[in-house]
Amino acid sequence: IGLVGSEMCIRDSAGTLTLPEKGTKFPAVVMVTGSGAQNRDEEIMGHKPFFVIADYLTRNGIAVLRCDDRGTAASQGTHATATNEDFATDTEAMVNYLRSRKEINAKKIGIIGHSAGGIIAFIVAKKDPSIAFVVSLAGAGVRGDSLMLKQVELISKSQGMPDAVWQGMKPSIRNRYAILQQTDKTPEELQKELYADVTKTMSPEQLKDLNTIQQISAQISSMTSPWYLHFMRYDPGQDLKKLKCPVLALNGKKDIQ
């Protein structure tokens, strides 16, 4: 089976639609990338996992649409201030584009999301009951703060941190994540509260170290970005409970990120 690829622009998103060479009214999938600015192939260090998956699916009779993230590669828009809700809107536009194509079976359109893309898939499928299926690859099923706490623990222990040391650190990390759950405060107010929490145990000498303070400020700025705040507060499990379509969730046993 061959395949036919075509470039298109959906609102401000640039992407590629691959179609099987023979037949019509194909089932189709929209592929959604993970966190960070990703191109349509989700390219990293020379690897193009979305290209590989799209190629395999198309050769097996499934049409695939994948796009560069907003503000990335050939897509327009701003990535830095976008949240997963914004990316869900982009994904909805991709689904609607597929429905407009005569080659696609509009009743058999699903979403494949990788990492944070799995979260986005759940958001879209909850809003749109006609989504045929969802595949979550290394996605999340719990609220962001719980996920991040477990992730930090697994990564720290994989690097040799004794459990006793981790148990000593855990309350401080959990408290900082709890600060981010305060939806009645502005990002600037959260930054001040986080800064006070992080620096309360630092010595006067450490507080005078410009490099240390700059690193802390950069980390706090990242933690209070629109995307991170939405991620930490959102519980995909609540949306997952409401889905009526089939869901396939795949997670690697050794994947600790």
Task: Give the positions of each predicted feature.
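Single conserved hydrophobic/aromatic residue that forms the stacking wall/gate
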Residues: 1-5, 10
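Alpha/beta-hydrolase active-site loop
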Residues: 81-102
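Alpha/beta-hydrolase fold nucleophile elbow
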Residues: 103-115
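Conserved alpha/beta-hydrolase
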Residues: 52-74
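Accessory cap/linker subdomain of secreted extracellular hydrolases
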Residues: 137-241
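The serine-hydrolase catalytic nucleophile loop
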Residues: 39-52, 69
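Short beta-strand/loop motif that positions the catalytic acidic residue
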Residues: 243, 249-251
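Short beta-strand element of the alpha/beta-hydrolase
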Residues: 25-35
